Amino acid sequence: MIAVRTGSKNDPSTNTGLAHYLEHMLFKGTDKYGSLDWAKEEPLLKQIDGLYELYNHTTDPSKRKSIYRAIDSISQAAAKFAIANEYDKMCQALGAEGTNAFTSTDETVYINDIPSNMVSKWLTLEAERFRKPILRLFHTELEAVYEEKNISLDRDGDKVYEKLFAELFKGHNYGLQTTIGTVEHLKNPSLEAIRNYYNEYYVPNNMAIIMSGDFDPDAVAAEVAAKFSYMQKTDIMSYVFKEEASINKERSFDVVGPDAENVTIGFRIPNAVTEEARAAKLIDLLLNNSVAGFIDLNLVKDQKLLSANSGVEQMMDYGVFMLTGKPKTGQTLEEVKDLLLGQLEKIRKGEFDKSMLDAILLNEEISNITKYKDNESRCFFLKDAYVQGIDYRDAYNDLAAMREMNKDFIVDFANLFLNQDRIVIYKRKGESALAEKIEKPEIHAVELNRDKQSQFVKQWLAMPSKAILPEAVNLKEVVKREYVGPAVLNYVQNTDNKLFDLTYRYDYGKWHNKSLSLVAPYMKLVGTKGYSAADISKAFYRWGCKFAFSEGNDHYNISIDGPEEFFDSAVWLLDRLMNEPAVDEVVCKQLVQDILKNRADAKLNPSAIRRALSQYAIYGPQNPMTWTLSNQELEKMKAEDIVKLLKGFKNIKHSVDYYGPREQAAVAKTILTLHALPADQTKHELAFDLGKSKSVDQLFKEQTQSARSVYFVHYSQVQASINWFYKSSVVNESEAAITTAFNQYFGGDMSSVVFQNIREAKALAYSTYAVYNSASMKNKPNMMMGYVGTQADKFHDAIGAMNELLTGLPKNDDIFSLAKQSLINRMETNRIKPEEYIGALHSQEEMGFSTTVPDMKMYAALPNLQMGDIVKFHQERVSGKPYTLAIVADRNRVTNADLSRYGKVTELTLEQIFGY
């Protein structure tokens, strides 16, 4: 991870969005890589620079179009000397995963997860990346940023966030400008301003290389010093701002859009370096720790609101404390606000005691133990400390400092900062004013030269690296099994810490019984004999434990985790809850009403609509999404029905999965003593909805397509979301190597054929992919699927581009070799964690696959694959198929005539795709 301590806060007021699109350009190469002939490319790029400056200062529409045509023309000429995405190709050769970057208010961060034997090559690559970045292929990348902006214009949540910050920070760039930038500024970029920004902020005293993993820190530090020695320290002008004036008055604003209604309340607080930041974190957890906070118990568990949360966003100069809530049916947003503020008032009055703080600190300690096991989490922790100007040792000791904080300080902070000086944003449902989307400029596709390689890349690829062999783990050997009564105990000992994870895994899931979906939400709201729901939540939280009910398609998990010292207590209380749950018809009735409200809200959410439509496109009207209780069936449900279902779990065949420090024999003894086990491992007696003769894997049949078809759902938005689906052959373990290699080459990441053609060359989408998706259930078919999210005015171009790639596969032996080597490198260096053994064993056994991971047959097969194998796979499984398209778009932007070009059109209602 490489963090630069600069973000949108530092954007020039005349070029907002600059930090963000500079982040995009840091993937385009330097004068040494990304170029076929720098001497010929450079003068053309200088011409483009000058044209953009002229374009910026021209207001006449016809002259601007003429200038942009010139930019487009010269860009095509310059692209003949460019090699697109050589950075991503090198990352692929490393075996890197998660290659990405992001920009926020105070930071720009570049991320890679690399094999430990590739650290030296990665440092060579990054040192060159930041030496002299070249702003090539700019106008097509800017189109991707336009798409990102248009996506934000469709998101009600983004509008709320922007309005909140604009009102909280009247004199600070946190509120005066956004990370994505204004439409006007995005349409008038300045390459000169980008270079000036880079030269000012991308300097060694404003950057940090942050690493966590298996390496020698002293050796790496010396290598960093040598390879980045070209960088020169310079003075950086600090961002200067005037302290925001305090206004002891609530100010409220409306944001209107098609998504569900909600309330957001924001308070301006001091920055992350202060003691007040710790107080804010403690108050956040007192209110909302997801188990036993004031909001959790009094608003969510007591069913006063549909949902409610608190949160803190800490930045370099200020922080923001937020409360959010969604109304129940018939509730006003003003009532939601009052309920949220009522819980905050408890903090202001000091209505909490030391035991609550002790429980919070214990749970935070447990959270840190889990978090700091993960390399990525460690890096983000160090990154946050660096960006916010906190010594990492102080940040690491944050918990100890919070233990020393007294109650009076917390109460004083709440009264001083979480008071009337607040902003309330009411997100109301309705038609918003038509967003000023960025229209598609007239540009032409550029050459990518993907079959070419710069001299730098050739030399870099030839750099040696220490070989690492994969570590094969036989899951049947590392997972110890024994019978505990009639149940199988799967056991793995935790030798790292004193935390346990226990799961009861039942052979009964939501595909067996639609009503099963009510168990988890009901059990969060009720208690058991002698214990209220609040009592149970407080007890688990006091112990640092969590319990969860979660449904799968063909199984159901009930789990607990926490410190070993409370294992027996947690097992006992969970079993009490499972076997003696309260029958509360009032809670059940209100739960049903909340589910109905959530269902109505889902129909307003474009992501939920897209997911539902995708299921319909794959399976038809009977699919996993519509496999649900109707609203009428739901309203007839009673608490006694849910309780009967839950009590029946003790008669269902299940396994007991344990990962923790306790010895296996002791775990078995506890389970036999405290957990209700079936007399025999028989199946559940409750009726299977479609008849007991039908197997769950045959419940839903993927549609067999004989002709192209289009399913369409209308949603008022700037973007059009387009999915492709085609049912292929039954999943087969022996095809793992070819399918994985195909995906890596064709559509799996930023260096893939799909991404390079649709986004990089043609600038038709911000997000796009295409993969051959292996089935997750035995004997089920694989699915070829693709996706493009694009502006409605690029609709036909985007579909045409994807269809072209699905029909004919561009061939490049060098790029395929890199893709193949990337997979081999990952298999050699990735390691399965002990806490993952049991879950992996279940998955492999259910699929009928080898229980040794990684798949050593796949590892042996990968080196022998050739480009011709990928071409053959594409011809047989991908090309010429009658794809089903699932499209969510605004019918005023995408007409029926537009849709009918791609097959028989079926417009579906929300009721049809959701099943209610």
Q: How should each PLM-predicted stretch be described?
A:
Residues 2, 23-27, 31, 524:
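Active-site-flanking alpha-helical
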Residues 119-122, 217-221, 275, 331-335, ...:
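Short, conserved charged micro-motifs
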Residues 146-154, 243-257, 360-372, 560-564, ...:
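Short, conserved secondary-structure transition motifs
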